[in-house]
Amino acid sequence: MAFQKAVKRTVLVCGGALATVLGLSQCSHYRRKQVNLACLKAAGCHTEPVNREPPSREAQLLTLQNTSEFDILVIGGGATGSGCALDAVTRGLKTALVERDDFSSGTSSRSTKLIHGGVRYLQKAIMKLDVEQYRMVKEALHERANLLEIAPHLSAPLPIMLPIYKWWQLPYYWVGIKLYDLVAGSNCLKSSYVLSKSRALEHFPMLQKDKLVGAIVYYDGQHNDARMNLAIALTAARYGAATANYREVVSLLKKTDPETGKERVSGARCKDVLTGLEFDVRAKCVINATGPFTDSVRKMDDNKAPAICQPSAGVHIVMPGYYSPESMGLLDPATSDGRVIFFLPWENMTIAGTTDSPTKNTHHPIPSEEDINFILNEVRNYLSCDVEVRRGDVLAAWSGIRPLVIDPKSADTQSISRNHVVDVSESGLITIAGGKWTTYRSMAEDTVDTAIKVHNLKAGPCRTVGLFLQGGKDWSPTLYIRLVQDYGLESEVAQHLATTYGDKAFEVAKMAKVTGKRWPIVGVRLVSEFPYIEAEVKYGIKEYACTAVDMISRRTRLAFLNIQAAEEALPRIVELMGRELDWSEIRKQAELETATKFLYYEMGSKSRSEQLTDRTEISLRPSDIERYTKRFHKFDADEKGFITIVDVQRVLENINVKIDENTLHEILSEVDLNKNGQVELNEFLQLMSAIQKGRVSGSRLAILMKTAEENLDRRVPIPVDRSCGGL
């Protein structure tokens, strides 16, 4: 009976798909022609940027304060806000952008890192005959192709595998994926294909083998989201937009329209978050592009304005790279609760996510342990039982807030729109909300079109289709080779610089410090296991980085890849930034504390540390307890029952290992559960038990004590009969 239902369902879907194919095929040629014409038109009207390099931050602030009136003021420095600024300034409009935090500090840096058309939206469009969903997918696929073209250094096509565990699913999903290719038309990245079970396991050897039928592989795009956002903002700055981070809007300015007698929004009162200085920025039009905080700006305009944003939290986790193949992702289309989970390689690590749950609006979202465990359980369902998915392998975790919106002009005020909404208030405030990363450019185009119409601005047509972003124009896949040959950088570092900065990588390489080694000649790393170098800190300041958090999370992506590595790099990053920005010792200490707090709460360190508590059960075999107790007493020579930093220093001196005192304090603090400045035997056994269970991994104290024990054992005096002595 179930089989018959499945067959009927498949036949129904295939029939509907065939009808859709016939309908779409009629306009396929026309659509392709229109896209090509649009690209040619855009290419023909592109002008060169006003500035070869983005102006300094100080110059941007002076422009903001001294300009009598802008045509457009954009509030919000995420992908959409930066996109609006770029769209407006390239049309010839005098443009300003202000952001209360850093560019991409909110939702735009906490995505799944995909540039996708929304394959699941296409499924809904077909099953429910939803034209809006279809148009959204069609638009997103066009924007996907454009984004891959204008920022080739920051983005690339990624094959994604859809494992099939039931025979009837094969034709069902195959038809859907092929339709995805068809809707993309000339913008299709690569054609999807079917894999047999053996070929699927060859590509993804850690996949669950039992009942596996085969797999379907389709292509979407992947990018470095925070760097992409920054590239958009920097490109806008090069074209003449006055862009400034750490400028918070505290109120909207209004003036009376002489023609209508009504009050109109005419700018904003801004506050310098770093200094407290307040000043006015006047503009003919103000655009609200604040994502999840859309309603807070709307209420500045009208405190009776109804809320249109319904925030939803999406949690992601990062695991070691060996959890996924280097060049193929995985999609679980139907999790235990009906959600979709992606499992993707990114920056030599593995991203898994996402969740979708209602949340309260906050500037500092915290990933919950419940969501982290949900993702881990879904990962376990798809990976072979030979692969132990451990809680301790979660190297970073974050929560991003999706700004789901209700169209205030829709008859159904309870219906959430998955598309974007452009709203104009009675006083002329223009709000852009909703949408997704992939469609930021078309959202910006719609918003600026509306601004021009509502405020009678004189501007040219949209010019952002095919407009290269910062670093993209002269990039090539072999650019990194020149970095190796011309500057003496490591190949891994050179590849990282090329794919992060594009054709601007040479400027970073010029700043690189000599290593003092035979090879590499230049490029001192911030941490040994990642290709980030010290020169990037200096260059990051040119990219408007103001704080240590900016540097570890958005100029580099250390915080999103490994929170422990980010914490280790922090002192050096603060030292380098302090030297460039002339920070006092008090400011340096404050930056360290703020960045450490950011890692603890927002990047998953809190959840990770809670895996080891004073209530953690010790479940070790007697032989293990004996072995670990012996190891502990290598440090606790006086058998006090606890060890302090002095005990650790004494042992390290015996094996000629030098670690600075601050680092040692940090290492012991990770395990010191009752925070009394010493690690007791019971705490050490709790740590080793948690490591065995997989709840904790990478404990620096555990690694240090094991290494010390091995070195001490090697230094046991050699017996006389092994030293060629005696009879």
UniProtKB/Swiss-Prot annotation:
Modified residues (Phosphotyrosine): Y601
The keyword Transit peptide appears for this protein: yes
InterPro entries linked: DAO_C, DAO_C_sf, EF-hand-dom_pair, EF_Hand_1_Ca_BS, EF_hand_dom, FAD-dep_OxRdtase, FAD/NAD-bd_sf, G3P_DH_FAD-dep
Recorded catalytic activity of this chain's protein: a quinone + sn-glycerol 3-phosphate = dihydroxyacetone phosphate + a quinol
Classification via Gene3D superfamilies: Alpha-glycerophosphate oxidase, cap domain (1.10.8.870), D-Amino Acid Oxidase, subunit A, domain 2 (3.30.9.10), EF-hand (1.10.238.10), FAD/NAD(P)-binding domain (3.50.50.60)
Keywords recorded for this protein, A-Z: Calcium, FAD, Flavoprotein, Metal-binding, Mitochondrion, Oxidoreductase, Phosphoprotein, Repeat, Transit peptide
Coiled coil: none
Residues holding FAD: 71-99
Function comment: Calcium-responsive mitochondrial glycerol-3-phosphate dehydrogenase which seems to be a key component of the pancreatic beta-cell glucose-sensing device.
Family: Belongs to the FAD-dependent glycerol-3-phosphate dehydrogenase family.
Name assigned to this protein: Glycerol-3-phosphate dehydrogenase, mitochondrial
Species name: Mesocricetus auratus (Golden hamster)
